[in-house]
Regions:
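Glycine-rich portal/gate segments that line the openings of hydrophobic small-molecule binding cavities
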Residues: 37-79, 83, 131-135
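Beta-strand/loop substructures that line and gate deep hydrophobic ligand-binding cavities in soluble
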Residues: 76-125, 131, 135
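Hydrophobic ligand-binding cavity/cleft-lining segments
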Residues: 1-37
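Well-ordered beta-strand positions in beta-sheet-rich domains
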Residues: 4-6, 57-59, 83-85, 101
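Hydrophobic pocket/interface hotspot
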Residues: 16-20, 26, 62, 71-73, ...
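Generic recognition of short, well-ordered alpha-helical interface segments
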Residues: 11, 28, 57, 120-124
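A short, structured loop/turn motif at beta-sheet edges
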Residues: 10-14, 64-68, 87-97
């Protein structure tokens, strides 16, 4: 199962990428982020821990990192693996489309509510990112 949200932002892809590659900037656009760590560099295969408000710390792995284009991370849950995609699509006109995708590795209809809950703050976080980049 998969949900995505995309929004056009007046920014260079390099500026948008800084909000992903620099974990200190995650606190600017992830409102419920309490703590995030990364063991190693921001590159494919690196692992870390993320803690969101009201949730226990969760381990994640960066499964794909393409600088200035996209990164994906994976978190294991009792309902199946969750993949989070963060893409920067360059419009070659001084703007980019930021697209965040959440995929739950399950086809079980009972897990749909869980996926909806995980995805629920994604649109708002992209609007916050837009405000950060366009100010």
């Amino acid at each position: 199962m998969e949900f995505s949200f995309s929004l056009k932002i007046k920014a260079a892809k390099e500026d948008a990428w800084e909000y992903y590659a620099n974990f200190e900037k995650w606190y600017d656009w992830e409102e419920d982020l309490k703590n995030i760590t990364l063991k190693g560099k921001f590159e494919t295969g690196s692992c870390g821990t993320m803690e969101l408000e009201g949730m226990p710390p969760m381990e994640y792995q960066l499964t794909l990192v393409k600088p200035f284009e996209e990164f994906w991370d994976k978190t294991e849950t009792p309902f199946g693996d969750i993949l989070f995609g963060h893409q920067i699509i360059d419009n070659n006109d001084g703007s980019v489309n930021i697209k965040h995708t959440v995929i739950l590795d399950s086809e079980d209809e009972q897990h749909l509510e869980f996926l909806k809950q995980v995805f629920s703050d994604v649109p708002q976080s992209i609007f916050i990112l837009k405000n950060c980049l366009e100010k």
